[in-house]
């Protein structure tokens, strides 16, 4: 029998990122490791183009936002590894990592990206469930009689 699984897998993309800047971004429980270098505007997430990895148009706009703010959407190539959380957290972590890497390329971009709050880590996370309650804040149904 032939191994049909290996034929259906997408080929690994080899990218040269020798002269790149590295940064990590975080959001909720997601962590993004980002390598940024001068290039043609391609963004790879876990070996796939970001359009294929993230299906939502909202996430596409969110990820390209740092480049749109500095008007250099086609000047950088991005390779990143994202783990943990869901799509929204992963997209947020990716934006945070890209922004930090852009600041490493050019310190003058720091004030521009900071005013848009892209270099600041969004510390909001899910609140833990408390004992004696149904959820974090929701209590059990109360019956007078």
Segments from the language model and where they lie:
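Intrinsically disordered, compositionally biased charged tails
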Residues: 1-19
């Amino acid at each position: 029998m032939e191994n049909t699984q290996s034929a259906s897998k997408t080929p690994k993309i080899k990218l040269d990122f020798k002269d790149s800047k590295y940064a990590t971004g975080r959001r909720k429980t997601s962590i993004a490791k980002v390598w940024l270098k001068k290039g043609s505007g391609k963004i790879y997430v876990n070996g796939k183009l970001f359009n294929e990895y993230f299906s939502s148009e909202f996430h596409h706009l969110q990820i390209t936002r740092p480049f749109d703010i500095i008007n250099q959407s086609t000047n950088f190539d991005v390779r990143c590894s994202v783990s943990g959380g869901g799509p929204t957290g992963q997209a947020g972590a990716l934006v945070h990592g890209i922004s930090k890497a852009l600041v490493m390329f050019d310190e003058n971009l720091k004030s521009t990206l900071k005013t848009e709050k892209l270099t600041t880590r969004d510390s909001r996370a899910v609140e833990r469930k408390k004992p004696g309650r149904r959820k974090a804040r929701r209590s059990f149904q109360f019956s007078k009689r």
